[in-house]
Regions:
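N-terminal loops that bind phosphate or other acidic moieties
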Residues: 1-21, 25-258
């Protein structure tokens, strides 16, 4: 897991770690990661809780006395592709839970569990970062990394834009093409097409987005720099067929746009 990978990096003696947070199957606010690095989570009977998103509500005490001391000696940066907070309607559970198979009832419980965990962190560790943009990334791992690893957080797409000098390249372009597997209401929460569109908007360049599917809420993107959005699938087909023909479908759609 992530905690084990951080520990391995510490064993190698690194001074800087960049952790990319995107999709995950977890929803535990980084508690599992923290356990791997030496933290303990105890229930009302002072027994250690086997942490998962469904067990966070059992925790009554957070013990960080055994947390790996080397964490204080490294600079850890989170590169997040979303800016969701930990909890609430735009938080980890409500936005990403359904993608992981959570039912509406499960989503509500998971969100309550994350809120409980965040309250414990606030009261016992005097750290309150649940509302920071990106805290909800990867099932709340952004939150856990800030709390237990002292990580700072940056937009993943901003890091890429900076290192690739994208703004300079867009300034010389007539049109900007971007895209991802699916474009919907989540895209505006820091996904790559949104970041690209923001740069292009500042430079008054039109942005054309191509995507495997167009979901709900894309209308907001038209106010954020996106000029047009095109789906690349020509007709009704199943997912394996769409994936198999993705490259050709994208090529054909771009030819037609041109």
């Amino acid at each position: 897991g992530t905690g084990e990978m951080i520990k391995a990096a510490l064993d190698l003696g690194v001074s800087k770690i960049i952790i990319g947070l995107g999709g995950s199957i977890t929803n535990d606010a980084g508690a599992g990661m923290a356990q791997a690095l030496g933290a303990k989570f105890l229930d009302a009977h002072r027994s250690e809780v086997a942490v998962g998103g469904g067990q966070l509500d059992q925790i009554r005490m957070i013990d960080i006395s055994g947390l790996d001391a080397r964490l204080k000696q490294v600079e850890i940066t989170i590169a997040s592709d979303v800016d969701n907070p930990l909890t609430g309607i735009n938080g980890a559970s409500y936005v990403f839970g359904p993608q992981k198979g959570a039912t509406p009832e499960m989503v509500q419980q998971l969100d309550q569990n994350l809120a409980h965990f965040a309250e414990l962190v606030s009261k016992q560790l005097n750290i309150n970062v649940k509302d920071i943009a990106g805290a909800g990334a990867a099932g709340g791992l952004g939150f856990g990394l800030m709390v237990f690893a002292g990580a700072s957080i940056r937009s993943g797409v901003e890091l890429v834009i900076e290192h690739t000098q994208l703004a300079e390249k867009i300034a010389q372009a007539d049109y900007v093409f971007t895209g991802e597997g699916g474009i919907d209401f989540q895209t505006k929460f820091g996904k790559t097409p949104f970041g690209v569109a923001q740069v292009a908007k500042r430079l008054n360049k039109p942005v054309i987005a191509c995507t495997g599917y167009i979901g709900e809420g894309v209308e907001d993107l038209y106010n954020e720099g996106v000029t047009a959005i095109f789906g690349i699938v020509d007709g009704v087909c199943d997912l394996p067929t769409a994936l198999e023909n993705g490259e050709r479908n994208l090529e054909r759609r771009c030819e037609n746009i041109a």
